[in-house]
């Protein structure tokens, strides 16, 4: 678990965290988390006290659209190592056989 400061107007690379489940708690600021739902990008705007869960292998990126203030988030992962796999673009995970999304 660790605390991360996201600089004003920062945008991360598109990435996923491999087999790691990622839990994010927003301490301050209004970071946004961007995913792809198979039709286009989906943006989740957050506020202090919000919680975001990112399942394993789900491509996403983080953004702090605030031009002046950093965002502070606490990140907990289900693996000991911090896995980050950078991607050229966001994409939706294919449906699993038998129904349901990954």
Task: Map each language-model feature to its residues.
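A short glycine-rich, His/Asp/Glu-containing loop-to-beta-strand
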Residues: 1-14, 20, 80
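Beta-hairpin (beta-strand-turn-beta-strand) motif
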Residues: 28-29, 36-38, 56-59, 76-79
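A short, sequence-level motif marking secondary-structure junctions
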Residues: 48-51, 91-92
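Short beta-strand His + acidic residue motifs that chelate non-heme Fe in jelly-roll/DSBH
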Residues: 13-15, 33-34, 54, 60-67
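Double-stranded beta-helix
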Residues: 4, 40, 61-102
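Conserved hydrophobic/aromatic beta-strand scaffold that supports enzyme active sites
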Residues: 1-5, 23, 43, 51-53, ...
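Tight coil/turn sites that cap or link beta-strands
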Residues: 7-10, 49, 55-57
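A short beta-strand-loop-beta hairpin characteristic of the jelly-roll/cupin
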Residues: 11, 20-48
């Amino acid at each position: 678990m660790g605390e991360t400061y996201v600089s004003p107007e920062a945008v991360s690379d598109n990435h996923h965290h491999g087999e790691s489940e990622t839990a994010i708690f927003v301490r301050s600021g209004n970071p946004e988390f961007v995913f792809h739902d198979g039709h286009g990008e989906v943006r989740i705007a957050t506020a202090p006290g919000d919680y975001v869960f990112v399942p394993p292998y789900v491509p996403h990126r983080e953004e702090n659209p605030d031009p002046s203030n950093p965002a502070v988030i606490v990140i907990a992962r289900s693996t000991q190592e911090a896995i980050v796999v950078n991607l050229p673009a966001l994409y939706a995970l294919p449906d699993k056989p038998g129904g349901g999304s990954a």
